[in-house]
């Protein structure tokens, strides 16, 4: 009797920290810092679906040459796609009302009332905002589709940048540009859609 009980218990202990979301796995706890570009995918899934905004800071570099232009471009792209942040999301991402109202008109560099600490928050918010274009079920199906070198990033002072393609159902959906940070973990320098979001079939 005791032996028969031990087996089910052992199998339960071996279940990873993922749950089914329409049949697809999404992390239920914050992933460990990414040791390689592919490790960022779980962070993206977790941030997009679980909305644990603290994880955004784990996967984003903090250098000015990333956060200033990155925040501007991410929010401009999200605006064009019609993706917005709710007041609750903005607050969770550390944006006060005045800052949240500026997301669609950010400068690409530091100005008097927009310093690097502000740009870091805006950049984190931009990452999450871009991810909102994908449904929870689609995130569950999202897979790694290859990694290539991004030589063009060098002209902006970013060395060693990699491009990770991700997608689902055989369709490449996004390119996630990333770089190894001083901590040894990988962080995201930019995200772009490789498909017309309005034409992307999602459940």
Language-model features, listed with the residues they occupy:
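Proteolytic processing hotspots in large secreted/extracellular or virion-associated proteins
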Residues: 158-160
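Short solvent-exposed beta->alpha transition segments
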Residues: 58-152
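Short, low-complexity N-terminal intrinsically disordered segments enriched in polar/charged residues
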Residues: 21-53, 58, 65-72, 76-84
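Short beta-strand edge/turn micro-motifs at domain boundaries
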Residues: 129-151, 163-203
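Bacterial N-terminal signal peptides that target proteins for export
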Residues: 1-9
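Active-site-flanking ligand-binding surface segments in enzyme catalytic domains
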Residues: 155
